[in-house]
């Protein structure tokens, strides 16, 4: 199966290059240089949703009940890296993205990447677990 960027899906991976990178990371995990390697199956919130609240009147049998209803104005923006793992040498979690030169420049990826890096910097400044964003360009 080919997607719009002509990347051929290889089983669970979105491209041959992702599969290749995963194959290179597995020996590092076996050597103990990294741990907890996994394909990222969750997304990070980079911009929360924007919602308004309106009062809705609901007719009951004997009275009118007012209910506050949440209306989503803008959906949340999320970022899903290709892989995440823990780097034992630097004691950092790593979010790894595999992108071609062309897809790196297209659509909303540059903005999402900047927002994700900004979120990680903010997270790291709060003294929590340290995260790093790495990108492999092919």
Give, region by region, the residue ranges found by the protein language model.
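Electrostatic, structured charged patches in enzyme active sites and in nucleic-acid/phosphate-binding
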Residues: 1-138
């Amino acid at each position: 199966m080919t997607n719009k960027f002509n990347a051929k899906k290889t089983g669970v991976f979105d491209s041959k290059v992702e599969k290749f990178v995963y194959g290179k990371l597995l020996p590092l995990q076996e050597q103990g240089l990294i741990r907890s390697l996994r394909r990222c199956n969750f997304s990070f919130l980079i911009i929360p949703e924007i919602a308004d609240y309106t009062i809705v009147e609901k007719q009951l049998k004997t009275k009118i009940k007012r209910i506050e209803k949440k209306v989503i104005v803008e959906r949340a923006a999320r970022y899903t890296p290709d892989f995440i793992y823990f780097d034992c040498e630097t004691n950092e979690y790593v979010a790894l993205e595999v992108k071609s030169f062309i897809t790196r420049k297209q659509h909303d990826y540059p903005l999402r990447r900047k927002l994700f890096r900004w979120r990680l910097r903010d997270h790291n400044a709060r003294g929590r677990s340290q995260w790093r964003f790495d990108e492999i360009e092919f």
